[in-house]
Design a protein with these regions (language model features):
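Catalytic phosphate-handling regions of large nucleic-acid enzymes and associated NTPases
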Residues: 1-165
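Conserved small/polar residues in nucleotide/adenosyl-binding loops
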Residues: 168-169
C-alpha cells in the first residue's frame, strides 16, 4: 500500500484536477456495494462511507491505497503499443489517449457524472451477462443482445416492462 497523498501527487503530475477532486475520486473508487459493484481501490484507513450526507474521510496523508487486481484489465496491455500517447498538460511526460481495457468497466460498474455540461448515468450490468453478450456479438453481428443482457443489475431486482430499449441507437 502507498500513502494516498503520494498517489494524489503522482496523479496531479499527469493532469492537474486538484488534490481534493483526485482524492475524493480515490475514496469513491474504494467504496464497495454502495458506489461500485467491483471497487478499483483497496484502501487502508478511514475512507468514509460512500453517499452519506457527511462523507467524512481522513486526509490523504493518513490513508493508504493501491489498485485492486481487476484494474490490470483496464491497462494491462498499455506497454504493447495498443494505444496512442500524447503529451500531458505541461509537456513533461506523456499519457495514453485512452485505456486499452479488456474489462467493460462502464457497463459493469456503472457511471454517474457531468462532462461538457451534460449529465450521464449508466446503470450497472451483470458481468457474466455482459461477457456472454460481447462474445455473442463478436461471433454474430446480428446477435440479439437482449437475449443475454436482460437489463441493469439492481441489487433489489427489477423487471423490464417493454422492449423499446432494444431499438434505441
Amino acid at each position: 500500500l502507498t500513502k494516498s497523498a503520494n498517489i494524489v501527487g503522482a496523479t496531479m503530475r499527469l493532469n492537474p484536477h486538484g488534490d481534493g477532486a483526485i482524492y475524493e475520486t480515490m475514496v469513491r473508487l474504494s467504496q464497495g456495494n454502495e458506489a461500485l459493484l467491483h471497487p478499483y481501490v483497496m484502501s487502508k484507513g478511514n475512507f468514509g462511507k460512500a453517499y452519506s450526507r457527511d462523507m467524512a474521510y481522513a486526509a490523504s496523508r493518513y490513508t493508504e491505497a493501491k489498485l485492486m487486481p481487476i484494474c490490470q484489465e483496464l491497462f494491462g496491455d498499455i506497454d504493447k503499443d495498443t494505444v496512442d500517447f500524447v503529451p500531458n498538460y505541461d509537456n513533461t511526460t506523456t499519457e495514453p489517449t485512452l485505456l486499452p481495457a479488456t474489462y467493460p468497466s462502464i457497463l459493469v460498474n456503472a457511471n454517474v457524472g457531468i462532462g461538457v455540461s451534460m449529465a450521464s448515468s449508466v446503470c450497472p450490468f451483470n458481468l457474466s451477462e455482459v461477457c456472454e453478450t460481447t462474445i455473442g456479438l463478436m461471433k454474430n453481428p446480428d446477435f440479439n443482445a437482449l437475449e443475454t443482457l436482460k437489463g441493469p443489475d439492481f441489487p433489489g431486482g427489477a423487471a423490464r416492462l417493454y422492449d423499446e430499449i432494444g431499438r434505441a441507437s
